Amino acid sequence: MADQSIISALVLGLIEGLTEFIPVSSTAHVLLAGHFLGFKSPGNTFAVLIQLGAILAILLVYFQKLLAIALALPTSVKARRFVFSVLLAFLPAALIGAAAHGFIKSVLFETPMLICVVLIVGGIILYAIDRLPLTPRYTDVFDYPPSLALKIGLFQCLAMIPGTSRSGATIAGALLMGTDKRSAAEFSFFLAMPTMVGAFALDLYKNRDALSFDDVGLIAAGFIAAFIAGIFVVRSLLDFVSHRGFTPFAIWRILVGTAGLVGLWLLG
């Protein structure tokens, strides 16, 4: 196994873990990095299984909260309403994602230039929203009514366009609907759990005939890197956005999208 391939797998896993839960689009970063690194994964296995590292990271960090919610379900109306709200928010992406999976993966994901443009446009939109003088009406995710959760879930559907960012779409939608920045990011975490598990299961099923474990080392390297980086981001993001907002992510999106366009132009 070439050392260069291991390094590329580690880099891509690190990128996946660092970008999955922040509003910069992990898909865009992983696809563009893989394109410029010339990384060839074994079948579709690497691209599918690398997501599992990030999924396990958020489940581990939020295990105590998830357990507390589960134990409260029999007696707490608030807990039941919260779980219902998260599942309701997940529903639009589940339905549209299942119906349009082939088109999204075979057409949109194969267009690096589109990804770069969407990164830039999304960065400009996120910057504008972060600068709006919005007055939050909701500061606790457990107070989000189901109707608000559903609207946030509809925003999440925009993330099916590579480069949009699942967390970016949900956070932007939540802010526009009257949430504060911290709870918007936290609801995005909770919504990520069923969404990422569902997307992972669908990808695994759709790619079942192409899956290959010929290079377990590459898969393990990317998985571990995504897992460790994901833990770091999930543990630190809420405090970060409470103090700095989302402008740093907006600027990063614009820079990466611009650099990607320049790179694609130079490489012809």
From Swiss-Prot:
It is found in: Cell inner membrane. InterPro entries: UppP. It is an enzyme of class 3 (hydrolase). Keywords: Antibiotic resistance, Cell inner membrane, Cell membrane, Cell shape, Cell wall biogenesis/degradation, Hydrolase, Membrane, Peptidoglycan synthesis, Transmembrane, Transmembrane helix. GO terms for cellular component: plasma membrane. It is a multi-pass membrane protein. One of its GO terms (molecular function) is undecaprenyl-diphosphatase activity. Its main location: membrane. It holds the Pfam family BacA. GO terms for biological process: cell wall organization; peptidoglycan biosynthetic process; regulation of cell shape; response to antibiotic. Its EC number is 3.6.1.27. It catalyses: di-trans,octa-cis-undecaprenyl diphosphate + H2O = di-trans,octa-cis-undecaprenyl phosphate + phosphate + H(+). The keyword Calcium does not apply. The chain crosses the membrane at residues 5-25, 43-63, 84-104, 107-127, 184-204, 213-233, 248-268. Belongs to the UppP family. Catalyzes the dephosphorylation of undecaprenyl diphosphate (UPP). Confers resistance to bacitracin. Bacitracin is thought to be involved in the inhibition of peptidoglycan synthesis by sequestering undecaprenyl diphosphate, thereby reducing the pool of lipid carrier available. This is Undecaprenyl-diphosphatase. It comes from Rhizobium meliloti (strain 1021) (Ensifer meliloti).
